């Protein structure tokens, strides 16, 4: 398998998921994890991000602690998306090769960060736990 192919990256993501805390894996049953190569341009413009490699993940939806069961509003389904290109770039060594150990760490931190948002954690709280 080509080391930098999408198939290779997906296998790394699967390895990381297997080692995630049970609470997060249970959340994944309710809030699916998607892997995309890079974020859409429209999203980057909305977020004020110029380099698409700077966005590694995104939670979209309503955090658990903000859901109201008596609300009549319709929301898009909750989801977490991680972006392959940015994560690969974040683990790139000076010689141009991807550090697989660092890549696994970055994927783990990104997934935990985004599911932290699902549980209602702020950026500051995530930073305190090392998932900033």
What are these regions (language model features)?
Residues 128-132:
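Short hydrophobic/aromatic patches at helix-to-coil boundaries
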């Amino acid at each position: 398998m080509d080391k930098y192919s999408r198939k290779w990256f997906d296998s790394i993501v699967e390895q990381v998921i297997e080692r995630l805390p049970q609470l997060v894996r249970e959340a994944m049953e309710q809030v699916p994890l998607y892997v995309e190569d890079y974020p859409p341009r429209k999203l980057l413009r909305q977020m004020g991000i110029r380099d698409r490699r700077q966005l590694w993940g995104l939670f979209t939806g309503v955090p658990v602690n903000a859901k109201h069961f008596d609300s009549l509003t319709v929301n898009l389904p909750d989801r977490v998306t991680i972006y392959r290109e940015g994560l690969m770039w974040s683990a790139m060594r000076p010689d141009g090769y991807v550090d697989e150990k660092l890549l696994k760490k970055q994927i783990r931190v990104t997934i935990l960060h985004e599911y932290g948002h699902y549980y209602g954690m702020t950026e500051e709280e995530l930073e305190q736990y090392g998932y900033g």
